[in-house]
C-alpha cells in the first residue's frame, strides 16, 4: 500500500493547501483547505506522524487593560493627576484635601521614583514640566482586544511595572504553525486524487446497496495499535476486596480497631509471657505512652500468667508487671482487635473478621516490610470444633483459586491445637500462608468466654505475591506505573 493510499481525504486537502502556501496558522489552513479548523488540525497531526508536515508551537504573550487601567486611560495615572494639579510646592495634607488619601499615597511614590517631584518636610515640590512617560504611552496604545508588546510599542520593563500595578493583565496563547516537509512536498507534486472514501460499512449502506458504488478507505492490519491504559483498581486493593467479599458471603461481620494498642491487648490477653522471647521476636514498635488497663480483666489475666488462674493450668510463673502491660505499641498483629472484640461480645454465636495493617520492626527486603496487611478472624460457638476450622480455611483458599490445601501442626502461644495452612503452587510447591488454631482456655477464661473459639491470622501480602506472580513484596507498595498498567484486571 502506497503512502497516498493511506491518506484520508482531509489529509490530502491539507497537504495540497500547504503545497501552495508552504506554512500556515490553523486559521489560514482552515481557509485554504476548506475544512473546519479542528478537522484541519487533526489531519495535520496525522500527517506529522507520517513525516509529511511539521507542527511547531510557541507561546504568544498578549496584554489587555484591567478595569483600573481602563479608568486611568480616561483620568490619567494618579501621579499625572497630581503633577498637573501642582502649580507650586504643596503640603501632603493639602493634597489629601483635594484627592483621596489612597491616591496621594500611590502617586507620591511614583512621583519621586519618576523624578517628577520631591518631598521636603511634608511638602511636595514639583520638578517642573514633565512629558508623558513610557507607561502612559503604553496605556494609551491599548484599544480593543489584547495586544502584543510589539503591537503596543512597549518594552518588558514598562509592561512589568504596569503588571505590578495591576493596570494590565497578561494572556498566554499557544500559537501553532503547520509547515510542509520535503517528503510532503514531493508527494503533493505527484498529484493527489481527492475522492470521498467510506470509513465504516453501515446497515443503511448494506440495505440500500449503495456500498457497491462507494470507495472504502483501506485499512492496514499489520500496524499495532497504541496501547490504551484505562483506570482500574490497584491489584493489591482488588485482592483485599476479594478476600473481604468471601468472608462477608460466608456470614462474617467485619470489625476494625486502632493501630495503637496496649501491651495488655497485644500480648498479655493472648497469654504471651512478659519475660519470654516471644515478645522480642515480634520486633515491636514501642511508643512513649501508656494507657489504663481494663479493670474487669487485668487481674484475671495477671493471675492466669502467674499461676494459671482458676483452671487446670500452671501459667507462666513469676510476677506479672502491671506497668509493662500498660505500655502502648503499634499493633504487631490484628489478633489484638479480634480478642478485644470477643471480650466485648463473650456470648455465642460470634463470626467476625478483620483485614487491616500490622507493624513490626522488620528490615525491608523482597519478602519483608515494616507494614503489612493481615487477615484475622474468629468463630465462637458451643458446637464448633477443630475440624470446622480446617473446613472453613480450606473453603476460603478454594474460593481464592487454590485447588490444593493442606494443614501442618504448628505452635502459637494463644492457640492449642494450632496449624499452619499451606497451598500448593506450581513451580513453588507447598507454601505456608499463616497460622490458626483454637484459643487456649488461658486466653478465653479471663475474658469470660465459655465456648470454643476458632481463630486464624493469614498473611495477605504473601497470598497477594502468589496470586500476582511477584517475587518482590515491595512492588505492592511502590508506584511502578509500568507494572500497574500491565497487571491483570481479572483472571478466569
From Swiss-Prot:
Its EC number is 6.1.1.20. It catalyses: tRNA(Phe) + L-phenylalanine + ATP = L-phenylalanyl-tRNA(Phe) + AMP + diphosphate + H(+). Its cofactor is Mg(2+). It is found in: Cytoplasm. L-phenylalanine binds at residues 335, 374-376, 414, 439. GO terms for biological process: phenylalanyl-tRNA aminoacylation. SUPFAM superfamilies: Class II aaRS and biotin synthetases (SSF55681). It is an enzyme of class 6 (ligase). InterPro entries: aa-tRNA-synth_II, aa-tRNA-synth_II/BPL/LPL, Phe-tRNA-synth_IIc_asu, Phe_tRNA_ligase_alpha_bac/arc, Phenylalanyl-tRNA_Synthase. Binds 2 magnesium ions per tetramer. GO terms for molecular function: ATP binding; magnesium ion binding; phenylalanine-tRNA ligase activity; tRNA binding. It holds the Pfam family tRNA-synt_2d. GO terms for cellular component: cytoplasm. Keywords: Aminoacyl-tRNA synthetase, ATP-binding, Cytoplasm, Ligase, Magnesium, Metal-binding, Nucleotide-binding, Protein biosynthesis. The keyword Aminoacyl-tRNA synthetase applies. PANTHER family: PHENYLALANINE--TRNA LIGASE ALPHA SUBUNIT, PHENYLALANYL-TRNA SYNTHETASE. This is Phenylalanine--tRNA ligase alpha subunit. It comes from Methanosarcina barkeri (strain Fusaro / DSM 804).
Amino acid at each position: 500500500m502506497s503512502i497516498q493510499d493511506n491518506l484520508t481525504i482531509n489529509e490530502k486537502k491539507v497537504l495540497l493547501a500547504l503545497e501552495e502556501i508552504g506554512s500556515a496558522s490553523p486559521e489560514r489552513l482552515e481557509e485554504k483547505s476548506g475544512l473546519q479548523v479542528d478537522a484541519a488540525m487533526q489531519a495535520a497531526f496525522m500527517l506529522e506522524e507520517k513525516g509529511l508536515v511539521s507542527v511547531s508551537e510557541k507561546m504568544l504573550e498578549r496584554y489587555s487593560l484591567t478595569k483600573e487601567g481602563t479608568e486611568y486611560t480616561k483620568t490619567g495615572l494618579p501621579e499625572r493627576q497630581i503633577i498637573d494639579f501642582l502649580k507650586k510646592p504643596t503640603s501632603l495634607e493639602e493634597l489629601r484635601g483635594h484627592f483621596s488619601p489612597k491616591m496621594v499615597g500611590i502617586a507620591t511614590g511614583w512621583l519621586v521614583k519618576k523624578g517628577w517631584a520631591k518631598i521636603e518636610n511634608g511638602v511636595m515640590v514639583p520638578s517642573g514640566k514633565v512629558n508623558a512617560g513610557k507607561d502612559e504611552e503604553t496605556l494609551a496604545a491599548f484599544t480593543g482586544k489584547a495586544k502584543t508588546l510589539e503591537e503596543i510599542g512597549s518594552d518588558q520593563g514598562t509592561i512589568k511595572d504596569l503588571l505590578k500595578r495591576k493596570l494590565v493583565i497578561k494572556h498566554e496563547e499557544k500559537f501553532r504553525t503547520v509547515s510542509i516537509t520535503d517528503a510532503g512536498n514531493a508527494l503533493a507534486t505527484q498529484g493527489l486524487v481527492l475522492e470521498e472514501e467510506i470509513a465504516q460499512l453501515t446497515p443503511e449502506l448494506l440495505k440500500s446497496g449503495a456500498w457497491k458504488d462507494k470507495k472504502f478507505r483501506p485499512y492496514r492490519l499489520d500496524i499495532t495499535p497504541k496501547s490504551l491504559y484505562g483506570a482500574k483498581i490497584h491489584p493489591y486493593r482488588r485482592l483485599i476486596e476479594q478476600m473481604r467479599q468471601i468472608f462477608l458471603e460466608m456470614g462474617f461481620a467485619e470489625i476494625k480497631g486502632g493501630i495503637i494498642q496496649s501491651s495488655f491487648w497485644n500480648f498479655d490477653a493472648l497469654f504471651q509471657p512478659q519475660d519470654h522471647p516471644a515478645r522480642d521476636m515480634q520486633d515491636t514498635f514501642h511508643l512513649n505512652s501508656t494507657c489504663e488497663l481494663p479493670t474487669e480483666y487485668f487481674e484475671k489475666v495477671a493471675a492466669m500468667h502467674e499461676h494459671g488462674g482458676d483452671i487446670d493450668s500452671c501459667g507462666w510463673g513469676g510476677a506479672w508487671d502491671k506497668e509493662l502491660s500498660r505500655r502502648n505499641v503499634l499493633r504487631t498483629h490484628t489478633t489484638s482487635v479480634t480478642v478485644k472484640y470477643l471480650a466485648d461480645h463473650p456470648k455465642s454465636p460470634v463470626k467476625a473478621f478483620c483485614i487491616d495493617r500490622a507493624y513490626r520492626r522488620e528490615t525491608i527486603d523482597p519478602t519483608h516490610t515494616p507494614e503489612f496487611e493481615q487477615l484475622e478472624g474468629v468463630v465462637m460457638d458451643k458446637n464448633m470444633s477443630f475440624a470446622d476450622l480446617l473446613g472453613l480455611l480450606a473453603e476460603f483458599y478454594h474460593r481464592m483459586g487454590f485447588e490444593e490445601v493442606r494443614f501442618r501442626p504448628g505452635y502459637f502461644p494463644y492457640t492449642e491445637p494450632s496449624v499452619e495452612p499451606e497451598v500448593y503452587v506450581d513451580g513453588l510447591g507447598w507454601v505456608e500462608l499463616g497460622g490458626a488454631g483454637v484459643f487456649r482456655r488461658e486466653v478465653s477464661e479471663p475474658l469470660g468466654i465459655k465456648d470454643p473459639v476458632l481463630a486464624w491470622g493469614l498473611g495477605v501480602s504473601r497470598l497477594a505475591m502468589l496470586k500476582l506472580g511477584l517475587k518482590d513484596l515491595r512492588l505492592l507498595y511502590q508506584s511502578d506505573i509500568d507494572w500497574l498498567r500491565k497487571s491483570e484486571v481479572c483472571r478466569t
